[in-house]
Amino acid sequence: MEDRKRPAISSADEIAPPSKRVAVNGSKAKDDPLDMKEESWVEAYTKGAIYRQMQEYSRKASTYESRLEELHKRSVHHDDHLRIIDAWWRQVLDEMELLLADSGVTSQTPSEPPYLSSVSFKDLHDFQKHLSEKGKGIKLRAEAILARLASSRGSIKPDAAKLESKVAGLLAAQKEYFAKLDRLKTEKDQLSEQLNAATLRYFKAEKKLDRAKSSQVQKMEQQAFANATRPSASGDVNTDSGETNGNSGELLLKYEEATAAATKQKEQLDVFLAEIKALQDENSTLKAKRDTLTDEDFIRTDVFKQFKNQNEDLIKRINTLEATNKQLREEAERLQAERTAFRTMLEADANQVTQELESEIILRDQDLARVRSARDELLAETTQHKARLDQERASVEQVKALASAKEDRITALESQLSRLQQSETQQAVSPDIEALTVEELRLKYTKLQQDFDSINMELPAIEKAYKKMKELAHRKAMDFSATEERMSILIAEKSKADQKYFAARKDADTRNNEIRSLRHQNSKSSEIIAQLKDLESQNRVLLGNLEKQLTDLKQSNASLMTENKKMEVTSLDAVRRTESLNKQVSDLSNLVKSKDAASAVVRERNVMQETEVEKMKVRLEHAQKDRDNWKNKALSNSSEEEEMLRTFALCTICRNNFKNTALKTCGHLFCNQCVDDRISNRMRKCPTCSRAFDKMDVMPVHH
């Protein structure tokens, strides 16, 4: 790393090689393994191998101890789990028997130990036998309890059928969850196998790393590098000496190239070893973290906190739902019992009330028959009274007609009376007829004619009045006979009505007594109805509360179902993401492997190129030394013309390097370093003519 940061030679005075090149010659690393004896080397190598094997044994022992401790914890957990399961089964069976205690059926519980006596069996057959016996006992007790439940339960209600359908649906969902659990278990087994393979690869890599970190192996590698570089260098020296007849400069150049390559390789090895050590430390820390991960580390993670919060919320909801479910079940049972008792009481009261009402209805039917008969009699009486009124109205009309006939008769009699009075006066005054004269006779005739006319005029009125009187008299006679008959009939009916009246009075007294008793019964029934209404209102309030609680439970159940569906969707998404991530991890691992292979190839190329660069640097240093020597020689033996030519060949900007780069725009010559500096500093104008140029306008003249 320090060689890369070494400053370049910028002047002719700095011709001495760096101090590090003098200090590092690479001879000690090559000569140390040659001084070691064979026995000591073998002993040191065996000690290193034994030490590495002991380290491997210690790692295996630590892993085995951690696994043993984990297995011990799991075995204790499984033992406690089996004990808890056994106690739970016994508690469930005891609770089922307590539920059947009200029916009066007693069951003989077999004498069993209060815990599992064969949890830690070593023999699998005995443990299987123990489990089969335990399962048979639990099945027998459960079948007996369920048979008693079925016999005592009777017909299945629709609620029970709905619950059984819900249980069937939940069992189907449970089977689906079991299938998912099996799939996740298989995936877990596959991941555990992959983890075991990765740990095996890790152990192998750690073993190789320990072997690479061993001092003996490093010495062997250094010796191999020295042996690989030495013959080539010696061969080159021999050939070069053969060709140049013992040219020591070229041998020294080759030697320095070999030493530079060896030092560069040593530096690369140091870098690789440092990287390997850092990776090993990181691997050991990661392994320690993986092995020493505690529950607190998991508790501190955000995923665990989120899962814990969700789990606590679900547990709280489940506890509240269980408590409310238990409370509602107890309240429903109590209400069912009250409902049955209330129904029996209502049926008894209704039967009693119906019997009383039927008896009252019979009495009311009898009363209705009596009332209808009384109504018929009253209707008959009213019709008779109407007929009587009609007859009286007709008699009144007849009386009126008789009065009119009487008036006619009175007028006729008045006219007759007046006529008779006149005739009497005339008779009293009139003399003898024979003594009368013609005039007197004529007068008398006219008078008689007048009387005759008046009599003729009176006769129709008299006849009419006579006819009317005759008719009225006949009618009166007939009416009188009819009234006599009606009077006899009415007298008989009056006697009958008196008898009916006394019977109706008796019936009215009995009805009044019945009405009093019915009113008393009605007051009692109204009190009972008021009590029933109060109970019905209370039941309605309870039903309303229960319906509200049921709606709340349905809503909570719906929210839980939606959350469950969301959790299923999220779990499916997580599974899909894990699958996609696993695919991505596999793709990335393949890509990383390919990239690692490519990087290894590139690294090898870089190593070879770095060694070549070191060799070229050594050659460059020798060339610079030769140049400086020739420069000094030339300066010591140069003339003014040579000095002028030399200054003309030097760059006009730095006066240090020779002109080797020309600008196409103007044709002036400068050194490539100055031109590159001006391009990088954005001073892209010729210092001689100030013409602009670009990177494409630069042209090398010679090398």
Curated annotation (Swiss-Prot):
One of its GO terms (molecular function) is ubiquitin protein ligase activity. Keywords: Chromatin regulator, Coiled coil, Metal-binding, Nucleus, Transferase, Ubl conjugation pathway, Zinc, Zinc-finger. Pfam families: BRE1 (PF08647), zf-C3HC4_3 (PF13920). It is found in: Nucleus. Residues 1-35, 213-246 are annotated as: Disordered. Gene3D superfamilies: Zinc/RING finger domain, C3HC4 (zinc finger). SMART domains: RING. Pathway: Protein modification; protein ubiquitination. InterPro entries: E3_ubiquit_lig_Bre1, Znf_RING, Znf_RING/FYVE/PHD, Znf_RING_CS. A zinc finger (RING-type) spans 651-690. Belongs to the BRE1 family. E3 ubiquitin-protein ligase that mediates monoubiquitination of histone H2B to form H2BK123ub1. H2BK123ub1 gives a specific tag for epigenetic transcriptional activation and is also a prerequisite for H3K4me and H3K79me formation. This is E3 ubiquitin-protein ligase BRE1. It comes from Gibberella zeae (strain ATCC MYA-4620 / CBS 123657 / FGSC 9075 / NRRL 31084 / PH-1) (Wheat head blight fungus). The lineage of its organism: Eukaryota, Fungi, Dikarya, Ascomycota, Pezizomycotina. The gene is BRE1.
